[in-house]
């Protein structure tokens, strides 16, 4: 094990007899690096995003489907170790369990893949990001394909691992029309996509917490929609079980039209509040006039403290040598700051002492800094 310096930063090299599992994977890393180095940078970026969304969507939906299977299953003593899913109506406890499983699964996986592909896992979210210009059309199409494939893979895994079949298909509640289902899915997906746009696409100090807010958005969306439409909010989530079970209801289209319409509605709302400069909405009119510099900073996305040049110079002046500022001030204010000179004799030569006096500002307490500093910065603040 050794430490080297790369671009001024210390780098840990693992080698020698004390190699770890990470170091033993280096040959595999070299193979991948050699393979992907031949791919253009833009194409490589698409490949990374597609792989991230494929794996992330599979992991997210597999956990969500598994939680739903647990919630829907009920033990049946008369059938031995068999599991019965026959219930008259889904209970609120089951809905809560399903919603929590989907929400917490999204939090964990989105946080994991956030820096790889964005952790979208939903074609509707990808389309919303395309509508606002966050991603281009090529990336959007590739992500949607990867997300659909991931949903099919997750459904196949759940179908093959859990006996009793797959019971996570999204269906309308009896008596609910497709038109009502479209509206429900549109509203719930709009809320989810708007959360993504404000917490992830809109950069701010809490962007790193975006997966938590997005997961909570899925949680409340499932609470509101599972009973009525299955709580899809995700075309891929509805496509996966339908493909694996080869069961496409006649109203399957609502799980595409509703979420895509919701993505468009969320994009319109986002564009509207951006055009209205929502950053300044919390400031009163008096604050807008009293703090024009702070307002402009907030409008440009800078929320840090004001760092005017005069304050920077003042901070530097307090820490620099007082003699430098004294010379500059003396040259600039000779007519008002010089008093008659006093002469002293040293042998046959005469030495003149010059004392500088700076006029104190009226009604101002004396400052501990040198007098020359007060005069210099006094003129700057006066301007």
UniProtKB/Swiss-Prot annotation:
Main location: membrane
Cytoplasmic face residues: 1-46, 115, 162-180, 229-252
Pfam family, one: MIP
Disruption phenotype annotation: Leads to a slight reduction in the vegetative growth rate and delayed conidiation.
Bilayer-crossing regions: 47-67, 94-114, 116-136, 141-161, 181-201, 208-228, 253-273
Gene3D superfamilies cross-referenced by the UniProt entry: Glycerol uptake facilitator protein
Segments of this protein annotated with the region Disordered: 332-383
UniProt keyword Membrane, yes or no: yes
Membrane topology summary: Multi-pass membrane protein
Reactions it catalyzes: H2O(in) = H2O(out)
Domain of life from the UniProt record: Eukaryota
GO terms assigned for molecular function: water channel activity
Keyword vocabulary terms for this entry: Membrane, Repeat, Transmembrane, Transmembrane helix, Transport
Family per record: Belongs to the MIP/aquaporin (TC 1.A.8) family.
Name the record gives this protein: Aquaporin-5
């Amino acid at each position: 094990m050794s430490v080297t310096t790369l671009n001024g930063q210390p780098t840990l090299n693992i080698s020698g007899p004390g190699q770890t599992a990470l170091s033993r994977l280096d040959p595999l890393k070299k193979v991948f690096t050699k393979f992907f180095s031949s791919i253009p940078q833009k194409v490589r970026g698409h490949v990374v995003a597609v792989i991230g969304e494929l794996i992330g969507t599979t992991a997210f939906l597999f956990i969500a489907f598994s939680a739903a299977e647990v919630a829907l299953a009920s033990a049946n003593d008369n059938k031995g170790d068999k599991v019965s899913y026959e219930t008259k109506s889904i209970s609120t406890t089951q809905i809560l369990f399903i919603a929590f499983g989907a929400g917490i699964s999204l939090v964990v996986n989105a946080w994991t893949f956030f820096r790889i592909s964005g952790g979208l896992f939903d074609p509707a979210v990808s389309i919303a990001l395309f509508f606002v210009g966050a991603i281009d059309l090529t990336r959007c199409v590739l992500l949607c394909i990867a997300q659909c494939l991931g949903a099919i893979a997750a459904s196949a895994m759940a179908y093959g691992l859990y006996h009793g079949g797959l019971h996570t298909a999204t269906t309308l509640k009896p008596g609910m029309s497709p038109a009502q289902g479209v509206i429900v899915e549109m509203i719930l997906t709009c809320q989810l996509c708007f959360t993504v746009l404000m917490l992830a696409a809109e950069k701010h100090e809490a962007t790193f917490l975006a997966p938590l807010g997005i997961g909570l958005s899925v949680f409340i969306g499932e609470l509101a929609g599972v009973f009525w439409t299955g709580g899809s909010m995700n075309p891929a989530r509805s496509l996966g079980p339908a493909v694996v079970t080869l069961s496409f209801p006649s109203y399957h289209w609502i799980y595409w039209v509703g979420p895509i319409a919701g993505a468009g509605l969320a994009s319109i709302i986002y564009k509207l509040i951006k055009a209205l400069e929502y950053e300044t909405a919390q400031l009163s009119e008096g604050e807008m006039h009293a703090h024009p510099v702070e307002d402009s900073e907030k409008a440009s996305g800078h929320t840090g403290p004001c760092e005017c040049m005069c304050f920077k110079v003042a901070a530097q002046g307090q820490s620099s040598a007082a003699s430098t500022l004294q010379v500059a001030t003396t040259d600039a204010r000779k007519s008002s700051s010089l008093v008659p000179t006093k002469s002293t004799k040293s042998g046959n030569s005469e030495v003149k002492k010059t004392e500088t006096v700076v006029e104190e500002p009226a009604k101002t307490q004396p400052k501990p800094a040198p007098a020359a500093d007060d005069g210099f910065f006094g003129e700057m603040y006066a301007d």
